[in-house]
């Protein structure tokens, strides 16, 4: 639904994907069995190349947290009915792919072979995170470290990143560092800060000053201006350590059915203050 100038809405930061024609290898099975090799020259800050686009039924943002795992938002990889309403069911992995590069003209495209999610967060909020298991390792690509053993802290400065675009953005879709701020509220599954978020930023990393991923962009109050800070909601990672462990096991070749239960939304968050800041 289009936003009028100055109108505010609480939206998840997704947008419809652009169409990208992908070249297919002549010997697809053989090519898919080989690891992906990153180009020799990436961006001036190579770590930024770990922030990628996630494209399924909508277009979102994700973060490489290992050579074959991408962290994003759960609501970015769920099914919708014919009315566009969220169905509490994940997309098939083959419907989702990851685009590499800093804008809407990717230099690489990688398929997904498994989607690891909690049994909540289908629309936004607590549990709004998903880990995509890629069909090949991205050898040579930089990765970010998710902070799983320390809770977000009130007063901690955070910076969101994403591939979103607001109506008044002067540039085409590209990787952007958003205006962030200090965390002012922490609950059992979320934390909040005033930040500038655009549609398409959902799933993007929320980075600490030490450049660890402390959360995932879930939802925000947005208008048409990318410089406007609004009330933003970020999903905590530390509550879902078992989800990250399961994703690593699945990436290593184990079946999800072989693993202990990992989709529970009754995780164990690390201790943190939950009162609103003064």
Model-based region annotation:
Residues 1-4:
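Bacterial N-terminal signal peptides that target proteins for export
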Residues 11-13:
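C-terminal motif of bacterial Sec signal peptides marking the signal peptidase cleavage site
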Residues 16-27, 65, 69, 77, ...:
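C-terminal subregion of chymotrypsin/trypsin-like serine protease catalytic domains
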Residues 27-47, 85-139:
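Conserved catalytic-core segment of clan PA serine endopeptidases
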Residues 41-60, 135-143, 167-249:
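Active-site region of chymotrypsin-like
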Residues 44-91:
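Catalytic histidine site
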Residues 55-57, 65-67, 73-75, 100-101, ...:
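Active-site-proximal beta-strand/loop segments in catalytic clefts of secreted hydrolases
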Residues 80-89, 113-123, 134-169:
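Active-site substrate-binding loop(s) of clan PA
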């Amino acid at each position: 639904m289009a936003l009028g100038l100055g109108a505010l809405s609480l939206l998840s930061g997704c947008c419809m994907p652009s169409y990208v024609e992908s070249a297919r290898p002549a010997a697809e099975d053989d090519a898919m069995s080989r690891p992906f090799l990153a180009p020799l020259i990436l961006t001036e800050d190579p770590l930024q190349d770990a922030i990628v686009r996630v494209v399924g039924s909508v277009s979102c943002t994700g973060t490489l947290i290992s050579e074959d795992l991408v962290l994003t938002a759960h609501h970015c990889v769920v099914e919708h009915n014919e009315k566009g309403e969220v169905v509490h069911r994940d997309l098939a992995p083959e419907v989702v792919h990851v685009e590499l590069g800093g804008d809407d003209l990717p230099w690489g495209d990688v398929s997904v072979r498994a989607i690891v999610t909690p049994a909540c967060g289908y629309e936004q909020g607590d549990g709004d995170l998903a880990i995509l298991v890629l069909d090949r390792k991205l050898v040579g690509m930089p990765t970010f470290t998710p902070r799983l053993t320390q809770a977000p802290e009130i007063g901690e400065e955070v910076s969101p990143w994403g591939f979103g675009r607001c109506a008044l953005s002067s540039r085409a879709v590209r990787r952007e560092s958003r205006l962030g701020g200090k965390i002012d509220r922490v609950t059992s599954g979320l934390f909040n800060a005033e930040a500038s978020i655009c549609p398409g930023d959902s799933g993007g990393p929320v980075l600490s000053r030490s450049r660890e991923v402390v959360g995932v962009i879930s939802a925000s109050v947005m208008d048409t201006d990318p410089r406007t800070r609004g009330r933003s909601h970020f999903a905590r990672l530390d509550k879902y350590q078992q989800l990250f462990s399961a994703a690593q096991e699945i990436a290593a070749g184990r079946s999800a059915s072989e693993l202990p239960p990992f989709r529970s939304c009754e995780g164990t968050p690390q201790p943190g203050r939950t009162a609103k800041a003064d």
